Each structure stands twice: as structure tokens, then as C-alpha cells.
Design a protein with these regions (language model features):
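Short beta->alpha connector loops at strand-helix junctions that form conserved
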Residues: 39-40, 60-63, 123-126, 285-287
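Short acidic/His/Gly/Ser-rich catalytic and metal-binding motifs that mark active-site loops
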Residues: 1, 68, 77, 192-196, ...
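Amphipathic alpha-helical segments at domain termini/boundaries
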Residues: 49-53, 83, 92-204, 208, ...
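Conserved active-site and cofactor/substrate-binding residues in soluble primary-metabolism enzymes
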Residues: 11, 15, 82, 127, ...
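Hydrophobic, small-residue-rich alpha-helical packing segments that form membrane-like cores
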Residues: 2-30, 34, 40-56, 61-112
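Active-site-proximal loop/turn and secondary-structure-junction residues that shape catalytic pockets
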Residues: 41-43, 239-241, 287
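A structural preference for short, pocket-lining loop segments at secondary-structure junctions
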Residues: 1-8, 22-36, 60-64, 181-184, ...
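Conserved small/polar residues in nucleotide/adenosyl-binding loops
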Residues: 288-293
């Protein structure tokens, strides 16, 4: 796939995959989630990079399963996706071993993978299923997330694309190809903020900060992948600042409630994605009623 892709697509692909791994590690650090990578077979290239983002890597000892960076002979790992950084800085693999590992298309198996710190646990094939289940249960028991809480279903985004306009319920994108810019308009909340985290959770995916984060994230990814010639993104907002501050206060005052925490983390990931998008970013304050209320 990548051999037939443009350079720009490769850059966006690698950036997106690394942002995904960063989100996994951020969830482990702040969200009470733990990720377990159970490798039975070959984890090569991006497959092993995904495993590196996990908190614990298990490998079956069957003389065939292996981990590697190169996916095939003469196909090396793509740079700037965090692989070498994770094995050296996160897993504390010796740099000389990391250099050798990066050249081995056949990968590293069994006891050698464990000794090189490329995995955390080597498991005999005869006990693989039971050990993975037991390890997953032990890791899950470490979480502070409520056992009886009901999740919030995330429905499809209300999204329409017509010509140079991309519209969501809360976000609008208008593209000016002559000037090479995209204007992103954020619509503030129409209703006052809920007074409790439970009331916010009851709103589900219609809760304004959650809905905004999802739509804005989707819009930025659309601009990254589908509009490579747009070099400037202008952000505008419309709405009532006092109403917005009510939502801000709710998120600020209840950081330990699981739903509020997840919304805050979603917004953080989205803003980081915007910050790392290779476009010039401008906020048009003159047209912003939200900011004028501060």
C-alpha cells in the first residue's frame, strides 16, 4: 500500500498511526486503561510498533512467533513513527541491540526476545490461552474505572460534504482554494451546561464538549488527508460565551468522574492533533463572539 502512495500520504499515515499509539499510552497514564499485546504469530513493522504502545507484551514460545521492525527484506521501518524511541527510551533496550534488531527481517523469537527486552513475558504454547486470560484479568483489576458504569454509545457523525463545504452539527469547514485556506467555524452550545457529571453523561454523544471534540477531530483529519494544498486554517467561533463557560466549569470541577475525564482527554488529543497538523493556524478573533465574552 505505502509503495503506491504519495509522500504526503505516507507522512499523514505515519503521523496518524503514531498519534494513535500516543493516545493508547496517554490512556494508560491518565484514563485507568491498560493495554495488553498478546503476540501469537508475527508482529512486524507497524504491528510491533502498536504492541510497543501497550503496557505489557506477551509472546508465545512456539519457535515461529517473532517481533520485528522490517516487514520484509529490504523494507525498513518508516522514520518518525516512534518505534526506535519506544524500544530504547521506553523499553530500555540497549542501543547496539536496537540497531541490530532494526535490520533483522526475520525478527527475534522466544528467549532472545525476552533477554533483549523486546517483550515482557514469554509463554509456552501449551498454556498460552490461560495465561493471556489471567494476565488480562490481573491488569483489568488495577483500573480505577467503575465496574458497573454504563458506557456511552457513539453514533455516526452528522456529516455532509457539498462542494467546498463540510458541515457537521457543531463544526463547519469552508474551503477557499484560490487563497489556499480553510475556515473552520465552531458553533457554541445552544443549551446551558448540565449541573452534574451524571446529567452530562445522560446526554451521551450529544453532550456539547464530546460532540465538538469528535467533529473537530474528524474535520482536521479530513483537511490533512484530502486537502493537501490548503496551507492555512482559520478558526472562528460563534455563540454565547457565558453558556460556554458553564461547560468549561463542569469539566474543570469534576476531573475525577470517569465520563468527564474521558471528554477532557478527547479534547486534549484533538487539540494536540491540531497543533501537530502541518498547516499555519490562525484564530479570527474579530468574528468570535465566544471569546469576546471572556
Amino acid at each position: 500500500m505505502l509503495s503506491q502512495s504519495s509522500h504526503g500520504h505516507k507522512v499523514n499515515f505515519c503521523k496518524f498511526t503514531n498519534e494513535t499509539r500516543n493516545a493508547i499510552e496517554d490512556a494508560t497514564a491518565h484514563s485507568g486503561q491498560t493495554y495488553l499485546a498478546a503476540v501469537s504469530g508475527s508482529a512486524a513493522g507497524g504491528g510491533y510498533e502498536l504492541a510497543l504502545a501497550a503496557d505489557h507484551i506477551m509472546l508465545v514460545d512456539d519457535r515461529n512467533s517473532a517481533v520485528s521492525f522490517p516487514e520484509a527484506p529490504l523494507l525498513a521501518v518508516l522514520p518518525a513513527t516512534g518505534g526506535l524511541t519506544r524500544i530504547v527510551d521506553k523499553r530500555k533496550v540497549r542501543r547496539d541491540l536496537a540497531d541490530v534488531f532494526s535490520t533483522l527481517e526475520e525478527g527475534v523469537k522466544g528467549r532472545r526476545a525476552l533477554e533483549w527486552r523486546l517483550i515482557d513475558e514469554l509463554v509456552p504454547k501449551s498454556s498460552w490461552g490461560a495465561r493471556v486470560t489471567a494476565r488480562a484479568a490481573a491488569l483489568a483489576n488495577r483500573s480505577d474505572r467503575p465496574d458497573q458504569a454504563e458506557g456511552v454509545p457513539l453514533g455516526p457523525l452528522e456529516r455532509s460534504l457539498a462542494g467546498d463545504r463540510l458541515n457537521y452539527r457543531l463544526v463547519g469547514v469552508e474551503i477557499d482554494r484560490t487563497r489556499g485556506l480553510a475556515t473552520v467555524t465552531i458553533r457554541g452550545p445552544a443549551e446551558p451546561a448540565p449541573t452534574t457529571p451524571e446529567a452530562a453523561q445522560a446526554q451521551g454523544d450529544r453532550f456539547w464538549p464530546l460532540a465538538l471534540g469528535r467533529e473537530l477531530d474528524d474535520a482536521i483529519l479530513h483537511l490533512r488527508f484530502n486537502e493537501p494544498e490548503i496551507g492555512l486554517i482559520v478558526f472562528r467561533s460563534v455563540g454565547d460565551g457565558a453558556t460556554l463557560l458553564g461547560y468549561d466549569a463542569l469539566l474543570h470541577e469534576h476531573p475525577d468522574h470517569w465520563f468527564v475525564r474521558e471528554v477532557r482527554l478527547l479534547l486534549k488529543r484533538t487539540l494536540k492533533r491540531i497543533d501537530l497538523t502541518s498547516r499555519s493556524l490562525i484564530t479570527d478573533r474579530k468574528s468570535t463572539r465566544l471569546n469576546s465574552s471572556h
